[in-house]
Amino acid sequence: MTDALTAFGLTAADSGHFADVLAAASSNANTNVSMMGETFKYCAPVAGALGFSVEDTAEAIGLMGNAGIKASQAGTSMRSIMTNLTGDVKLSGAAIGDATIATTNADGSMRSLSAILADCRVAFGGMTEAEKANNAEALVGKNAMSGFLALMNAAPEDIAKVSGDRKSVV
């Protein structure tokens, strides 16, 4: 856990909050704290470097867990997804045309992971299954494609459930 804390720029004093976030997310998703810790081992350095919050990262991990993508598989997928979200996200489809999703704020800082993924979900909602697969592969690669599609296909109720309780611990 201390490695993940350090990666997010947190201190030992934040360990209680970090544990609360993991516990809340895991209790609302098909995963557990141990598997979430394994996932964080792989993706926390990238998440922290990009300025993504522990809360948003835990939400994404929980949503992947609901799709059966857990532990190291989720960690490597999350790491790849986050790495590929460092520039503008370019998507295309017959119904949406060419779309660009900004990943940075006007000051150059990264937008929140939840906001970026929410915008991607809107774009993916207007695509055929084939377009979703093609865009996911082009954006994050074949190895992370299943994890990314799990995030894109998450039901609004699942997103609310996974994020709901963890926001109360912030």
Ranges and model annotations:
Residues 29-30, 47-50:
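Short coil/turn linkers that connect adjacent helices within long alpha-helical scaffolds
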Residues 1-26, 35-43, 53-170:
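Alpha-helical architecture feature
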